[in-house]
Amino acid sequence: MGDMRLVVAGAAGRMGRVLVQIVQQTPGAMVSGALARADSPAIGQDAGVLAGCGEIGVKISTDPLRAVADCDGVLDFTSPASTMVLATLAAQARVVHVIGTTGLSPEHLARLDAAARHAVIVQSGNMSLGVNLLAALVEKAARTLGPEFDIEIAEMHHRAKVDAPSGTALLLGEAAAKGRNIDLPSHSLRARDGHTGARPEGAIGFASLRGGGVVGEHKVYFAGAGERLELAHVAEDRSIFARGAVKAALWGRGRKSGLYSMADVLGLGDKI
């Protein structure tokens, strides 16, 4: 089996350029295609040159059908609309689809579940080892500490991030909800303003900060009477997400079709 041919979607963006770099540095993987929006000034440029790793002979295009038809996997940190298009194409081509796109709605997730009948999909709000380990710890803490400890999740990202709470914050919220054996949507508290009254019992609160060039910071608070536990993760470089995504793609190659998470890739299931 030769190198895994990977298409980088959103190759002209910050995350896309890092993905190109990491794929080219990873043994057993290569960039076979690079996609960008039709209005991108990067169309026609060599993806490696744009990413700062030298010419790789792959020009950035706007044709996902052609790119996906000639690859083994897709690395997708784009938008929900683009992810849905790529999910359909990846399912048709039976290739691995690694999704780091955030802001996905329940309808989007249902469509991914359907696409996963025909392809390997690895979807996560965060691809880093540290965050996924944090999620496992949050689940255990929520289960162990019990409802007398209030759960609050705070996150901060760069000023250009368009969705809130972040996908990682929601990943951590889902982990906390699982630990408490509750449903996150019906217990999620995302806005406080004015006279809010007392904190709802059993709520999982979210606070989102935006500013500067912050890659990503997350902290989960378990606040009890007389004591507080804080679990945190700080991302200092986008390469941690790219390395996780490439690891997920290589892990998914040859695997049975289905919808997987980074916890599956990292084998975190029942180890904590």
Swiss-Prot record:
A UniProt-annotated Pfam family: DapB_N
Enzyme Commission identifier(s): 1.17.1.8
GO MF terms held by the record: 4-hydroxy-tetrahydrodipicolinate reductase; NAD binding; NADP binding; oxidoreductase activity, acting on CH or CH2 groups, NAD or NADP as acceptor
Residue runs in coiled coils: none
CDD domains: DHDPR_N
Entry's Gene Ontology cellular component terms: cytosol
Subcellular location: Cytoplasm
Gene3D superfamilies: Dihydrodipicolinate Reductase, domain 2, NAD(P)-binding Rossmann-like Domain
Residues of the active site: 157, 161
Catalyzed reactions: (S)-2,3,4,5-tetrahydrodipicolinate + NAD(+) + H2O = (2S,4S)-4-hydroxy-2,3,4,5-tetrahydrodipicolinate + NADH + H(+); (S)-2,3,4,5-tetrahydrodipicolinate + NADP(+) + H2O = (2S,4S)-4-hydroxy-2,3,4,5-tetrahydrodipicolinate + NADPH + H(+)
GO biological process, one term: lysine biosynthetic process via diaminopimelate
Residues bound to NADP(+): 37
Binding site for NAD(+): 10-15, 100-102, 124-127
Amino acids binding (S)-2,3,4,5-tetrahydrodipicolinate: 158, 167-168
Domain of life: Bacteria
Described function: Catalyzes the conversion of 4-hydroxy-tetrahydrodipicolinate (HTPA) to tetrahydrodipicolinate.
NCBIfam families given in the database record: dapB
Family to which the UniProt record says this protein belongs: Belongs to the DapB family.
Name of protein: 4-hydroxy-tetrahydrodipicolinate reductase
Lineage summary: Bacteria, Pseudomonadati, Pseudomonadota, Alphaproteobacteria, Hyphomicrobiales
Gene name per UniProt: dapB
